[in-house]
Structures are given as C-alpha cells and as structure tokens.
C-alpha cells in the first residue's frame, strides 16, 4: 500500500534533505557534494545558497576559498547551465550528463559551424594554453588563439569552452579579481575510480533523490536533463532503496535520507535548488502565485512555502 503524505510533510522532508533545516555540514565543498550539483549561473547568489546550508552559517570568504582552491568547480554540467560541483564528484557527474548536454547543444554547434573536428581542435589548443597551471580568462584564451580562429557570431567561445568542459578537459580556475578563469581539469581534480555507466547512473539518481526527495520522475528529468528511460533504468538498479509515496494525487519517489524536520522561513537566493530542483513546484509554492516565476526572483519562503518575491 502506497503511503500518503500531506504537503507539510513533503516540505519538511525536502528542507531536511537539502540541509536547509538542522544542517550538519560546516565545509562549503561538502554542501556542494551533498547536493551533487547546485545551479550557479548567478555566482554571488550561488555562494549564498551554499551558506544557507552550512551549520555554522559559513562566510563568503570560506566559499570563495573553496572555489579558488578547486574544491568546488563551476562549469556547465546540466541542461546546460552553470553549476557548482565538488571536485571529487565532477567525473561522476560528467559521465552521466555530458552526452545529454552535448545533445542539447547540437543545434548551437551547427548554427556556429562548430563541427566535431573544429571542436576537438579547439580542445587540443586550449589544453596546451592552460597547461602547467596557466589559468586564463575567456578573453585571454580568445586572444591567444590563432588569428581568425574564432568567428564573430558572439557565442563561439561560450560553446567551444562548454564543449571542452563536457569532454573533461577544462574547468573553473581561481578567480582573478571579479574575473573567472579556466584551468585544466586534471590539474584541479584528482582522478577517481572509474565506474560502469550503470553504477554511475544509479549513484547519480540515488543521490538526487536522497537530497531532493520526495520528487517526481518529471522533477528528476527536468533537473538533470536525463531521459525518462535513463531514470527508469536507474530506479530499476536502485531497487528497494527507493520507495513511492503519494501526495495530492501525485506519485513521489523517496530514498533514505534525513527524517522530516521542522519547517523554516528564509530568504531564498535566485536559482536556489529548493525551487530549481523540481518541475512541479505545487508542493512548495503558494497557490496564489505563479510558481514558475517565483523560485528565481529572490523569493521569500515561509514555513517551506515560496510565498512571494
């Protein structure tokens, strides 16, 4: 018999699983690793999102230090959008998501005349430019390329660098003032034991459910960019590690994690995972508001409900 949960319990579980209530972690990189990946196109807001989940409140300096040291990396790994990923997890995440992000980028690759030989040629060039800790900004990389190598369509460099990220060649380097730099991934993140594709997929999906659940299959596919078939395969592999619960006529997936905690009220940063991790936000959004727009507009969360902005 499927267990039924009310809305408050859904919110209590999500708040606890996301370390937004009774957080236990004091290391910024551990928070990022706990959540597998955290959306981070707004850099200052993403640092704040980490701080919300630190048991000691953390500090901007502590998060910056973890990023500069390469313990937290910032690159395009889902959908594609900038995300924070812990260095220890980056190869796992890329193994699961890179192919899907390349597929999402295929139209832009074609539009920018970036065929595979050109993309691979750039990746080889940038590997040489960044070798031996030579961290460069995007502008510096562009200037160092052979004359006429990059077109004038505007997005060329963004997609060239994204390709190199997805191939596991480049990642974020330490910031230089307010400017992000690029570095070689192999110089920033130690190699980790290789997993089979099935093991990597099951681990990735299981960690999402333990840190975001209860969540639906559409929540997971929207957040991760994975296909329904991939998610179903992962659920088969996870077996009884995942249970199905019901709330308001919807089926939710739940994995072992922190027990439901208290409700909490807080100011939520733009693009925070409490809003962005779900396609269906009806369980966390006030019924009087458009929950598709609230989660990235510096929302006010009252007792776990996104109540305004």
Residue ranges and their predicted role:
Residues 1-153, 288, 294:
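Phosphate-backbone binding and catalysis cores of DNA-processing enzymes
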Residues 63-64, 158-162, 232-239:
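Short, hydrophobic-biased segments on the C-terminal half of alpha helices
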Residues 68-77, 81, 165-175, 239-247, ...:
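A short, conserved structural fragment
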Residues 84-90, 176-195, 250-260:
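Short, cationic-aromatic polyanion-contact patches
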Residues 93-109, 186-207, 211, 264-270, ...:
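Short, amphipathic alpha-helical interaction segments positioned at domain boundaries
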Residues 154-231:
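Loop-centered beta-sheet repeat module
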Residues 237-287:
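Non-catalytic regulatory appendages
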Residues 289-309:
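Glycine-rich, small/acidic residue-mixed loop/short-helix segments
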